[in-house]
Amino acid sequence: TYEQMSLFEDTENKERQQTERQIFDEALELIAKDPNFEKKKVIVLAQENWHQGVIGIVASRLCDMYYKPCILISHTNGVGKGSGRSIKGFNLFDALTHCEKQLIDFGGHAVAAGLNVNMSDIDSFIKEINKYADEVLTEQDMIPTVDIDCPLSERSVTLENAKLLSKLEPFGMNNEKPVFALAHAQVMNIAPVGADNKHLSLRIVKNNQTINCIGFGMGEFAEFIHQ
């Protein structure tokens, strides 16, 4: 029945979210244990039996969070399968091409790619891709930038306008999500909320108008936003 299908999909979605959160937390632990993390321009993390269907999503989150190219690798029986996401100015496919001697195979494009690697070659791969990144990425490239499509007034921030944006979907590489800016506003009451603090709550105030905001799955960004 429809109800059974809906319940199954809801359960499956919750399990995927739990798996994603677990991998994300484990990735953060690996980062915290790496004394050379700050020096590396490319994040490469490997763990046994990470879920293949989720590592790309987590790689994307880490890429946004640290503004570094990120590759997550799940390995079994000495062979790793990886999924990577990149930042502006760093062509991930070109980087993997440069490291092809350390890889079994790879594919993808400038901002997203997949790879297979023997775990016996993982250390040399990490060294080589970071060496390449040092050559092609400047310190300026590592500073996050945001391309604004349109400035907003506080009166334009409505649910009706948000729903209108859905008419532009589907978003993707050749149809990126539009980015709007509400300038000279005050950000207040920043806090992670929800189960496991995985969502973000904040309040924006401009010209005596208050806008309550929620960012789903964005709880980890709370510490990076300043009032």
Report each predicted region and the residues it spans:
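Internal, active-site/partner-interface "lid" segment
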Residues: 111-161
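Broad gene-expression machinery/nucleic-acid interaction feature
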Residues: 67, 79-81, 112-114, 143-147, ...
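Noncatalytic, beta-rich nucleic-acid-contacting surfaces in large DNA/RNA-processing enzymes
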Residues: 79-83, 188-191, 222-223
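Long, low-complexity segments enriched in small/aliphatic residues
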Residues: 153-205
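OB-fold single-stranded nucleic acid-binding module
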Residues: 121-127, 220-227
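Beta-strand/loop nucleic-acid-binding surfaces
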Residues: 208-226
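Conserved, well-folded catalytic cores of nucleic-acid-processing
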Residues: 30, 34, 65-69, 102, ...
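Hydrophobic helix-and-loop "lid/oligomerization" segment in the mid-to-C-terminal part
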Residues: 1-120
